Amino acid sequence: MTNQKRKRTSTAAPKKGGDELTYSSYLALDELLRLQRPRSKPEHPDELLFIIVHQASELWFKLILHELEGLIALLEARDTLGALTSVRRVNALVHIVTGQLSALETLPPQRFAQFRGYLGTSSGSQSVQFRAIEAMSGMRDEHFLQVLKQHGEIAPLVQRALAKPTLQQLFDDLLEAHDVTLEQIYAELHQRPLQMLAEGLLEYEQGFAMWRFLHVQLVERIIGPGTSGTGGTLGSKYLQTTISQRFFPKLWEVRSKFFNG
């Protein structure tokens, strides 16, 4: 009986500083819930919604970056099934971020106009984590690099993302390691895991494109198509140019080969 009691005690989580870990302390809720600081005077009742949706998006961006790091490591290790599981999680996270936009659709333009001036020059285009996600996913063209430099030096987080191989490059390397082509993974049944991974990557791009599209619609719904962004951007006109950007052009192009000989 004594031995059993000792065994149960030894498996208990150690206490730090004699304080019991609680839900609140583990999640640092006291600090987290103090981070919403509306700037409007008097405080506009809708500004808290605006802040929380954007803060929550940044938390999800942090997790997406973390998962993309893991996906890259799995692709580098040639772990097809592990990468497939990883990309499914990334896709679920992108879906969550996209769903959050519906909350901002409840913000009428006249009410946003009442506190928009308090945002100053802050803009979603300044999101370092979002830019890092784009870079890690495959955005490397000159236009993208010029956009990054609009706000000064490229942030270290984005620089690290740019230093990594893109997801497309890593998938190409995976195909080369298996000595197969893109056409073969779609034509040969035994290449099903690679095909599923390719479709998972394509779903990731589609999810990202859907977020972009709905973001454009949201911006135009709230501030209209002719209003400039708070950060000096062209507003929805700039966002429109991002919709057609693709991470995996080869995964789109291979489909044509089954119909055009």
Provide a role label for each language-model segment.
Residues 2-261:
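Surface-exposed peri-terminal alpha-helical interaction modules
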